[in-house]
Amino acid sequence: MHSISRMECWLVCLCKEVRGTMEKAMQYLDLIRKDPFLHAMLASYDNAAAAQVQDCVLDYGCGYGWGSYILSDSFRHVTGYDPDAERISFARRHFARKNIAFTQDGGLLAGRRYDVICLFMVLPYVEDSGELLARLGMCLKPEGFIWISYKSADTALLTVIKSWSQQRGFVLACSSSRRLSDREEVVEQCYG
């Protein structure tokens, strides 16, 4: 009779845990794909994941972590930041991967440099979106990109983003929109 070593037992348990985590993640992603608003958000992450630069990405305002999970297929290192402890806890439980670091500590972002920064549906919820764009722009590597999305109804953001890009020398690389409803669209822009 073959006895199982502690190491073999640990590896079997780890494999079951990882498989369970991945299955949960895929179940959540399937639910997201069925929701019109969240599906539009998913498309923004898919576009950012298709970027040519594939080293480090910051998912600022990562929420529950599903966008970071999508980005982790295309980038060597993903930092998912959100100030909400409950959301970060959920992300760590359901969307953990070796190449993802979820944090709620904004101080950890200081001094780091990223190839891509994603700000999907974040700017309408921050007090000073121009200041946040300026701060995050300094975290970009020289050839980096910032991907931004917001609802078309948030027209004031267009002025803030345009002013920021002109002051900081960022150029609009691409822009698109996707319908959420008869009245609303998600606007997506990439600056480099």
How does the language model describe each region?
Residues 5-76, 80-107:
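Conserved N-terminal segment of class I S-adenosyl-L-methionine
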Residues 179-192:
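Core SAM-dependent methyltransferase catalytic element
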Residues 143-151:
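Conserved beta-strand signature within the Rossmann-like core of class I S-adenosyl-L-methionine
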Residues 130-142:
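A short glycine-rich, Lys/Arg-flanked "PGG" loop and its adjoining helix->strand segment in the class I
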Residues 170-180:
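Conserved S-adenosyl-L-methionine
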Residues 155-168:
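Short alpha-helix
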Residues 121-122:
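Short catalytic micro-motifs in class I SAM-dependent methyltransferases
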Residues 118:
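A conserved beta-strand element that flanks and buttresses the S-adenosyl-L-methionine
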